[in-house]
Amino acid sequence: MNQQNNISTPKGRRVFLRRILFFLFLTLAVIALVLGLNLKRYTDRERKQDKIEKEITTEREKDGVGNLHKKYKDMIGWLEIKGTGFSYPVMQTGIEGHHKDDWQYYLHRDVHGEYSFYGTPFLDVRCTTDSDNLIIYGHNINGRRYFGYLQNFREETFFRKHPKFSFTAVGEKEKEYCVVSVLETDKYADTPAVIASKRMLDAACLLYTSDAAD
């Protein structure tokens, strides 16, 4: 037997140990590379999203919701909790002239129609901006971004400080809504809250969150 490959000899054990260390180093290098690439994708995604949000918020403050609609044809309004970072455009598709066959078009698209992990809040196709009940969907993002921010309503101090939110529809004045109830539920379960929200399209104003982007 070749002494170099015989781990029962000192030389064989050294060769075997070097091989183990080499494969261990190679494995760690691959893991580090994958983690590095994932971190870069995450930071690039965050940077791009921050830029989009800053641009459209600046445009809204400068030109108003009506003029924004001229640039973003699917935009139907703006949703905001004043005094917080919760301030987003609301889109709607699934209707004539607006991606009729895909009412969830903005589930994973930004305001420009490009792929986005975060998506953009959008109004249920069954609603119009003058409906009694506006069902608006948005991702429940970890870190309380987008509709993940609504988790703050679990805290009574936040609720008391921010008891209202506003919605400004294109061509209309800003309307304020009082938060009278906050329900947290599983969107896949037929809980009373989910059943009620599906049936009562003329009752109250609801904000839906999706956990698809947790």
Model-derived segments and spans:
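Intrinsic disorder/low-complexity detector
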Residues: Q4-S8, R126, A213
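Exposed alpha-helical structural elements
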Residues: K51, Y149, R199-M200
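Cell wall/extracellular polymer interaction/catalysis modules
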Residues: K71-V182
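Acidic, glycine-rich loop-and-strand cores that form catalytic or ligand-binding grooves
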Residues: Y177, S181-L207
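Conserved small/polar residues in nucleotide/adenosyl-binding loops
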Residues: Y208-D214
